[in-house]
Structures are given as C-alpha cells and as structure tokens.
Amino acid sequence: MQHEDKTPEQQENKTPETELQQENAPATPQEAGAAGSIDDRIAELEAKLAEQQAAVLYAKAEGENIRRRAAEDIEKARKFALEKFSSELLAVKDSLDAALNVGSATLESYRDGVELTAKQLTAVFEKFSIVEINPVGEKFDPNKHQAIGTVESEAESNTVVNVLQKGYTLNDRVLRPALVMVAK
C-alpha cells in the first residue's frame, strides 16, 4: 500500500464536491457549448410550457364565462318570453274593463263591444302564430281533435260534425285539441 504524501492543504482541496465538478466538467470546449445550448433549450421549452399553461387557463376561464352568459341569457329569455304577448293582451283587458264601466249600455252595444274585443284578441293570436282549430267537415285527426262522442249523421263516417270547443295550435304545435262530435 502506497502512501501519498500530501499536505493538509492539498487534502482539504479534494472534497467530494470538487471531485463531482471535475468529473462533470466538459472535457472539450464543444461539450461546454453543447451544455449551454441544452440549458438554453430547456429554458425555451419551460417558457413555452408556461405560455401554454396560461393559454389553457385563459381558455378555461373564457369557456366558463361563455357558459355563465348563456345561462343568464336563457334565464332572461324564460323570464321575459311572454312579455310581448302579455303587453298585447293588455289592450284586450282594457277593452273588457271599458265595457264593464259603461253605465247605461244596451245589449246591442255590449254585443258590439264584445265582438270588437274578440277581434282584438284574434289579432293578437294571429300576431303570435296562435291558430284556431275549427274542424267541422274534416276527417277526425286524433292529433288535433278529441272526440267527445259519436252521432248519427249524413256526413261521411269519422268526420267531425260538431265542435264543442275550438282547439288551438302555436307554431303548428297543439296547445289544446278541439273537442268534437264525430259522425258514425
């Protein structure tokens, strides 16, 4: 076993850290340049990663904002869906109130007032695509009619001969079927 004679100063300089540094130190200037470019590349990729993470967070926040605004718009649409229809009906209500407040009216003037009010209401219905179902003479259609009974009639079998209560559709969707009597 050989014994190396080193001064205590030389032994102090040789620590595990300095040994690691010497082992990891680039042997050539090319390796030193490559290590620097790797560090630059890592820094560049970390910057891109941070940028992409920020973009993802922004997109998530934007998506949440869109969902929130859509929910608010839907709630407003529900809340005020009948606003225009209701305001149109106010004129009909005003006409009925005016008729009731007339002191000395004849039966004929009441009838005229009711007819005008019915015309107002029909105009409101037309404006909002509410269509009357009055199927006298038509073939019975269970999608639009509700048969209350059958009667003997000269009309063709399964034909509506009498309407007890008119039905209505809204944009071709049945609000209420017509109550009808059908020929046997």
Swiss-Prot record:
Gene3D superfamilies: 3.90.20.20, Head domain of nucleotide exchange factor GrpE. Coiled coil: none annotated. It comes from the Bacteria. InterPro entries: GrpE, GrpE_coiled_coil, GrpE_head. Residues 1-17 have a biased composition (Basic and acidic residues). Residues 1-39 are annotated as: Disordered. It is found in: Cytoplasm. GO terms for biological process: protein folding. The keyword Coiled coil does not apply. Keywords: Chaperone, Cytoplasm, Stress response. Disulfide bonds: none annotated. It holds the Pfam family GrpE. Residues 18-27 have a biased composition (Polar residues). GO terms for cellular component: cytosol. The keyword Chaperone applies. GO terms for molecular function: adenyl-nucleotide exchange factor activity; protein homodimerization activity; protein-folding chaperone binding; unfolded protein binding. Homodimer. Belongs to the GrpE family. Participates actively in the response to hyperosmotic and heat shock by preventing the aggregation of stress-denatured proteins, in association with DnaK and GrpE. It is the nucleotide exchange factor for DnaK and may function as a thermosensor. Unfolded proteins bind initially to DnaJ; upon interaction with the DnaJ-bound protein, DnaK hydrolyzes its bound ATP, resulting in the formation of a stable complex. GrpE releases ADP from DnaK; ATP binding to DnaK triggers the release of the substrate protein, thus completing the reaction cycle. This is Protein GrpE. It comes from Methylobacillus flagellatus (strain ATCC 51484 / DSM 6875 / VKM B-1610 / KT). The lineage of its organism: Bacteria, Pseudomonadati, Pseudomonadota, Betaproteobacteria, Nitrosomonadales. The gene is grpE.
